C-alpha cells in the first residue's frame, strides 16, 4: 500500500483529504503530520497559491522521505482587488481567530455593492523534495452581509457559493466536500494518483 503524507496540521483539512481519498483507500494510506517526527513547515514566501503549496510539499516529502502533498488556499474578493488572497490566514494578524478575520473582511466590504468572491485552492504533489504536479480548484460566490452557520472553518460562514442560498457554514461537510475549491483540486489529485497506480505495478513518481 502506498503511503502519502498530507503535509498539514489543520485537522479540518485532514478530514477533507481523507474523504477525498476514500475511493482508493484500499491502495493509499494517508499519513499526517502527527504520524511523523516533529517538523516545522517552511515559511510561506511565495507570491501565488501554487508557489506556497509547492514549498510545503517539497519540504515535507524530503523530510519524511515519501510522497507528500500540501495545499495553499484562500479567498479572493473582487472589490478588494483580490485580497485577502494568499494572506487569507493572516488577514487580521498572526494570532487572529476565524471570527477576527471575518469581522475585518466585513468591515472592508462595508458600502461596497460588489461582493463577488472566489475560493482558490492549489494542491502540490512532491516526491523526494522535487515537484511532481500541481492541481487547482476554484469555487465562485458572494460574501454575505453577516456570518451564518457553524460548519466548516475560515471564511465558510460568510461565503455563499453560486447556485446555493446558504453559506458553506450552513451547507455542511457533505455538500462542501463535493463542491468546494479544495474538493475540486483534490478530485484532480486523486484522479492523477489513481491513474498512476493503475498504469504501474510498482508505483513510482519518477
Features from the language model and the residues they span:
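Anionic-ligand binding patches
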Residues: 2-5, 11-206
Amino acid at each position: 500500500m502506498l503511503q502519502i503524507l498530507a503535509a498539514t496540521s489543520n485537522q479540518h483539512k485532514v478530514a477533507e483529504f481523507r474523504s477525498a481519498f476514500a475511493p482508493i483507500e484500499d491502495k493509499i494510506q494517508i499519513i499526517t503530520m502527527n504520524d511523523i517526527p516533529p517538523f516545522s513547515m517552511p515559511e510561506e514566501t511565495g507570491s501565488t497559491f501554487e508557489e506556497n503549496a509547492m514549498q510545503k510539499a517539497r519540504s515535507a516529502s524530503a523530510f519524511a522521505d515519501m510522497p507528500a502533498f500540501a495545499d495553499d488556499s484562500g479567498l479572493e474578493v473582487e472589490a478588494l482587488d483580490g485580497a485577502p488572497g494568499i494572506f487569507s490566514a493572516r488577514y487580521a494578524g498572526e494570532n487572529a481567530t476565524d471570527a477576527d478575520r471575518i469581522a475585518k473582511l466585513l468591515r472592508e466590504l462595508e458600502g461596497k455593492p460588489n461582493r463577488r468572491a472566489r475560493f482558490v485552492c492549489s494542491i502540490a504533489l512532491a516526491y523526494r523534495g522535487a515537484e511532481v504536479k500541481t492541481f487547482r480548484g476554484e469555487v465562485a460566490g458572494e460574501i454575505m452581509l453577516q456570518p451564518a452557520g457553524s460548519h466548516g472553518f475560515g471564511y465558510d460562514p460568510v461565503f455563499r457559493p453560486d447556485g446555493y442560498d446558504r453559506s458553506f457554514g450552513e451547507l455542511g461537510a457533505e455538500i462542501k466536500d463535493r463542491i468546494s475549491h479544495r474538493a475540486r483540486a483534490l478530485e484532480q489529485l486523486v484522479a492523477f494518483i489513481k491513474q498512476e497506480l493503475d498504469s504501474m505495478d510498482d508505483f513510482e513518481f519518477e
